[in-house]
């Protein structure tokens, strides 16, 4: 199952929910939310912020959450050259402010 389903199921609030539906993708879930077939959707925050930025006033992101997750980048263990290039690119993006601009665009709460 998805991490969202697992996180919701672990939360005591899930006992107050009439039904928890699983979807194969976020687009289908958000379409059902838009048409009123759902009351709420649980998605990764970055996904939710992306959709709310594209549909201003149509969706609302709650400040509550069901926990946090960490993500990583997987590389072949022996690909030291790619690792060095990736590290250098990330360091450069942090140094020149590009990383902060990306974070501001995609991860911060939209103005309401």
Describe the residue ranges of each PLM region.
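Short helix-initiation/N-cap motifs at beta->coil->alpha
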Residues: 20-31, 69
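Short helices/loops that flank or line small-molecule/ion binding pockets
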Residues: 10-11, 26-42, 46, 54
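Structural recognition of the beta-strand scaffold that forms the well-ordered cores
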Residues: 21-22, 40-43, 62-63
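Periplasmic-binding protein-like
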Residues: 27, 45-112
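Bilobed "Venus flytrap"/periplasmic-binding protein-like clamshell domains
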Residues: 1-25, 45-49
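Surface-exposed patches in mature extracellular/periplasmic domains of secreted proteins
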Residues: 20, 63, 101-105
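Phosphate- and divalent-cation-binding pockets in alpha/beta enzyme and binding domains
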Residues: 6-7, 32, 50-51, 85, ...
């Amino acid at each position: 199952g998805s991490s969202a389903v697992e996180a919701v199921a672990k939360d005591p609030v899930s006992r107050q929910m009439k039904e928890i539906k699983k979807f194969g993708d976020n687009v289908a879930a958000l379409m059902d939310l838009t048409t009123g077939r759902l009351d709420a959707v649980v998605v990764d925050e970055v996904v939710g912020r992306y959709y709310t930025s594209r549909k201003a006033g149509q969706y609302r992101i709650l400040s509550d959450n069901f926990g946090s997750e960490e993500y990583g980048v997987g590389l072949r263990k022996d690909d030291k050259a790619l690792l060095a290039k990736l590290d250098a690119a990330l360091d450069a993006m942090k140094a020149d402010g590009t990383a902060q601009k990306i974070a501001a665009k995609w991860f911060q709460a939209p103005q309401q």
